[in-house]
Amino acid sequence: MDRRHVLLGLAGMTLTSAALAQSGVSPAGSGGSAAMGQAEQQWMQQTMMVGSVAMKSSELAIQKADDDNVKQFAKFEADEQKGLAEVLRSMVEGAATTQPQPDQKHAAMMEKLEQAKGKAFDRAYVQGQTEGHQELLQIQETFIKSGSKNREATNVAKLAASRIREHIEVLQDILG
């Protein structure tokens, strides 16, 4: 594994998170953007649910991971997911969005991680992140193809999709 490649990819994740957090995305319906319809709400809920699992599993990995690259990825991922969740919540009028609870599949993955230790934990975390990122990418691509008139939501999905592709590459490098 090329450690510099992994570290450069992780540094890029931080820049994207900062850009999202400072993007000044205006609430739905303002700034000339279309209101949040059913497609936008579904995209947001799905993104927040899978992102929440990525964040929680990464917070666990910060504590439990043995491999330094896994631990560093987890730190960047947790921070990025927090930033993305803030941006998504800011897009809803009144910001009354609650964090969705994980479904059974994601809850089972979290339980497996909580019980794993050492290299088995590292491998399970990276595999779980890879699967989660593939799921997040599918959510973003489906939304982008939907032709939403909400410019902010579409732009966030496009930016997220780009970063998710990079994360998948970094995760594959970590797996070796």
Summary of predicted features, one role per range:
Residues 2-9, 13-15, 22-176:
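His/Met- and acidic-residue-enriched segments that coordinate or traffic transition-metal cofactors
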